[in-house]
């Protein structure tokens, strides 16, 4: 009877990660927009440059461990060896050259891929104002006069200028197949410029944890033809609901897994209202603090004046007492 090898199953278990990872979609390495393609090139280039150092180190570590193993009595032993100009040149020169190249690439790509930098194109861009809520995305099209929740559309080969803010905690706006992510924060506006090189439906996500409904805070980004975009706008304008500053408080209430929702019209001032209401809140707090501080200062000054008056009164009483106690000169 042969004994079962407890390690025999490990070689089959080692295939499990490959099988599981086979179902994963490498979204970042399958970009559908120019910004995403440039970022993929940057990631691959930087990784290959670093592998110039990493791979030789791994190979030499394994080679030296094998060559100088205890059973290899033929390996040359040099106990007095301590320096080599060639080795010093390689271990210093190669990393320095790689760092210099990476530095140049970083400088160039940082400016080229700046999310605030408008994309070079002769086509008029589409402007979309994005607001992160709990737990959904509100999108306003100021030029078309419409708004949506958890769905956007735009023509392919057309720059899309996103103006992003938050009406809740800090969040992050991200369409992985199109390019960069950018944070959304209450009381301030961030910008992002993207473009789709082909038609398709791309997943948009929140890339920053924001509470219980975070996992369902997803939206669809539809890149279509110019005619397809106009048809989509017409469909939204046919929706029965509208969005105004008065009805907005109902929308902003926390909700999870919200389906795409259309608003046929939207108040032109809504995005500005969302953007500035936290600034006014800060001003009000500052004014209240100033009034409180002024009241404290006035009370302190009043108390100080009263203390001075009390001291003067006590001094006057002391002087009168001294006068009564002095003997008369006639006596």
From Swiss-Prot:
- InterPro entries with a match to the protein in the record: CcO_II, CcO_II-like_C, COX_ARM, Cupredoxin, CuRO_UO_II, Cyt_c_oxidase_su2_TM_dom, Cyt_c_oxidase_su2_TM_sf, Cyt_o_ubiquinol_oxidase_su2
Lipidation sites, kind N-palmitoyl cysteine, are 24
Q: Which family does it belong to?
A: Belongs to the cytochrome c oxidase subunit 2 family.
Instruction: Please name the Gene3D superfamilies in this protein's record.
Output: 1.10.287.90, Cupredoxins - blue copper proteins (2.60.40.420)
Q: What is this protein called?
A: Cytochrome bo(3) ubiquinol oxidase subunit 2
Q: What does this protein do?
A: Cytochrome bo(3) ubiquinol terminal oxidase is the component of the aerobic respiratory chain of E.coli that predominates when cells are grown at high aeration. Has proton pump activity across the membrane in addition to electron transfer, pumping 2 protons/electron.
Range of residues in the leader sequence: 1-23
GO:BP terms for this protein? ATP synthesis coupled electron transport
- Transmembrane annotation, as ranges: 42-62, 87-107
**One cellular-component annotation, GO:** plasma membrane
Sorted alphabetically, which keywords does the UniProt record give? Cell inner membrane, Cell membrane, Electron transport, Lipoprotein, Membrane, Oxidoreductase, Palmitate, Respiratory chain, Signal, Transmembrane, Transmembrane helix, Transport
Q: Which superkingdom is the protein from?
A: Bacteria
Give the way it sits in the membrane. Answer: Multi-pass membrane protein
Q: Which SUPFAM superfamilies match?
A: Cupredoxins, Cytochrome c oxidase subunit II-like, transmembrane region
Identify the residue ranges that face the Periplasmic compartment according to the record. Answer: 24-41, 108-331
């Amino acid at each position: 009877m042969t004994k079962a090898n407890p390690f025999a199953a490990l070689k089959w278990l080692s295939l499990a990660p490959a099988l599981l990872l086979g179902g994963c979609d490498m979204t970042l390495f399958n970009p559908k927009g120019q910004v995403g393609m440039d970022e993929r090139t940057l990631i691959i280039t930087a990784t290959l440059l670093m592998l110039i150092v990493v791979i030789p180190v791994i190979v030499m570590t394994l080679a030296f461990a094998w060559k100088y193993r205890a059973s290899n009595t033929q390996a040359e032993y040099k106990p007095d060896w301590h320096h080599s100009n060639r080795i010093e040149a390689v271990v210093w020169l190669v990393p320095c050259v790689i760092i210099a190249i990476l530095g140049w690439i970083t400088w160039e790509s940082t400016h080229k891929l700046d999310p605030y930098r408008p994309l070079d194109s002769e086509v008029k861009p589409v402007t979309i104002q994005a607001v992160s809520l709990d737990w959904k995305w509100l999108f306003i099209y100021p030029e078309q006069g419409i708004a949506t929740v958890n769905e956007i559309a735009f023509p392919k080969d057309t720059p899309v200028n996103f103006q992003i803010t938050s009406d809740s905690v800090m969040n992050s706006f991200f369409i992985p197949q199109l390019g960069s992510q950018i944070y959304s924060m209450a009381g301030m506006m961030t910008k992002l410029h993207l473009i789709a090189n082909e038609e398709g439906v791309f997943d948009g996500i929140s890339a920053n944890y924001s509470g219980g409904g975070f996992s369902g805070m997803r939206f669809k980004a539809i890149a279509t033809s110019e005619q397809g975009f106009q048809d989509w706008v017409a469909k939204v304008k046919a929706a029965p609901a509208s969005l105004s500053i008065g009805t907005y408080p109902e929308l902003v209430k926390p909700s999870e897994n919200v389906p795409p929702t259309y608003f046929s019209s939207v108040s032109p001032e809504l995005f500005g209202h969302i953007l500035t209401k936290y600034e006014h809140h800060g001003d009000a707090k500052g004014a209240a603090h100033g009034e409180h501080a002024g009241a404290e200062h006035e009370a302190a000054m009043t108390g100080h004046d009263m203390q001075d008056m009390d001291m003067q009164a006590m001094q006057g009483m002391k002087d009168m007492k001294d006068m009564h106690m002095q003997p008369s000169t006639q006596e």
